[in-house]
């Protein structure tokens, strides 16, 4: 195993550990814990805007060139449409957890609705976690700095995801959900090591992840009632932006 492969697999294991041990990444003060989570959201959003989104234009051009003879529908918009799809689908998953939607299930005599919502949302994020890990492994050939910035941003993003699920579902999530998410990350990394998807498919998935990350951080942490703090988000976004610009 090469040094790059070893570093990548270590990054995958550490990403998975965010879900396994994230519940202990909390301060005794709820206010301090909230500031940390909100700053993490800001940092991962900064990564999307300064690193992934600028790459989308390049990815769109590469996708168009790679698929010019495939007669695919709307090839010149495929990456951007994929990002939009990621945003919309994860908005739908987040919308399912809103109080008015969950209460509607109780009012119509469907006591199992809330558990179904949890399972659907968790399933979506299991697939998402595996996809993020897969893309990190496939992107590792760009060098250690690219791997490090991706790992840090997605690690902070997963802290937000883990905190949101733990806050909403408590013991139910701690008992099994976090283990499923950790396994998905490990599985995605394993698949990425041995299974190579076509380049145009990887570019499409990158767009999907960009849209999903923007939506998840925005709705999970910054929506009204979530307790997000502007200055913590600002500090996280600006701090990680400076890091990305510096390297």
Where are these regions (language model features)?
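Intrinsically disordered, metal-sensing/regulatory segments
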Residues: 1-247
């Amino acid at each position: 195993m090469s040094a790059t492969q070893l570093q990548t697999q270590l990054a995958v294991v550490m990403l998975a550990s965010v879900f396994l041990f994230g519940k202990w990444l909390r301060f005794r003060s709820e206010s301090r814990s909230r500031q940390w989570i909100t700053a993490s959201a800001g940092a991962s959003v900064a990564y999307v805007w300064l690193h992934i989104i600028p790459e989308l234009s390049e990815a769109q051009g590469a996708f168009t060139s790679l698929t010019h003879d495939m007669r695919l529908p709307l090839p010149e918009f495929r990456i951007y449409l994929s990002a939009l799809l990621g945003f919309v689908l994860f908005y739908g998953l987040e919308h399912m957890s809103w109080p008015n939607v969950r209460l509607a299930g109780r009012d119509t005599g469907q006591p199992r609705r809330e558990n179904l919502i949890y399972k659907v949302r968790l399933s979506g994020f299991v697939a998402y976690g595996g996809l993020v890990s897969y893309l990190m492994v496939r992107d590792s050939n760009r060098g250690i700095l690219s791997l490090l910035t991706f790992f840090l941003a997605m690690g902070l993003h997963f802290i937000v995801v883990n905190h949101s699920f733990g806050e909403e579902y408590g013991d139910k999530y701690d008992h099994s959900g976090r283990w499923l998410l950790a396994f998905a990350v490990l599985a995605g990394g394993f698949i990425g090591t041995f299974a190579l998807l076509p380049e145009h498919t990887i570019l499409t998935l990158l767009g999907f992840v960009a849209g999903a990350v923007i939506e998840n951080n925005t709705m999970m942490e910054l929506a009204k009632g979530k307790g997000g703090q502007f200055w913590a988000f600002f500090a996280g976004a600006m701090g990680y932006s400076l890091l990305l610009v510096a390297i």
